[in-house]
Design a protein with these regions (language model features):
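Charged, amphipathic alpha-helical segments and their flanking helix caps
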Residues: 1-32, 47-145
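A short, hydrophobic beta-strand-centered structural micro-motif
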Residues: 39-48
Length: 145
């Protein structure tokens, strides 16, 4: 069995990079958030690869990738709206009933792209309030060879 998680994460990155805006500014997209990163931004990381079915001729996996939108405001200011607006753009680009990532050149067939839930979190620090929208994005992937 081959591991396609990194291929899905790359496709997610490519789909979002340069395409999500808030207040006329394009959000940065990261796989690793640099110390120089500034809010708001999008953070993408892999969660799991669950082998859902296998037989003598193929493996089918459920790949879970998390996509987070993180915004920050001075303590007791701001709100979740920017996270919700950015997440709305993200789900429109990623979640589909009929068109999925093309991984055929890597010997995979993607035939599912689902929103497995969006979680909204508010975190207070000494100086800021962070608002996070976290999408659990599931792709169903078949290894073709």
């Amino acid at each position: 069995m081959k591991e396609p998680s990194y291929l899905i994460r790359k496709k997610v990155y490519d789909a979002l990079d340069g395409n999500i805006t808030l207040n006329s500014a394009t959000l940065s997209v990261y796989n690793v958030v640099p110390s120089s990163g500034s809010y708001p931004y999008i953070y993408i990381y892999s969660i799991s690869n669950d082998n859902t079915e296998s037989n003598k001729s193929k493996y089918i996996s459920s790949i879970t990738t998390r996509i987070e939108v993180i915004t920050a405001f001075d303590t007791n200011t701001g709100g979740q709206l920017d996270c919700i607006l950015a997440m709305n753009q993200i789900t429109q680009l990623l979640v589909s009933q009929s068109s999925y990532f093309d991984l055929s050149s890597d010997n995979f067939n993607v035939y599912g792209a689902r929103n497995n839930g969006i979680t909204y979190i508010t975190e207070d620090t000494d100086t800021q309030t962070l608002y996070r929208a976290i999408l659990s994005f599931e792709s169903t992937v078949e290894q073709t060879s």
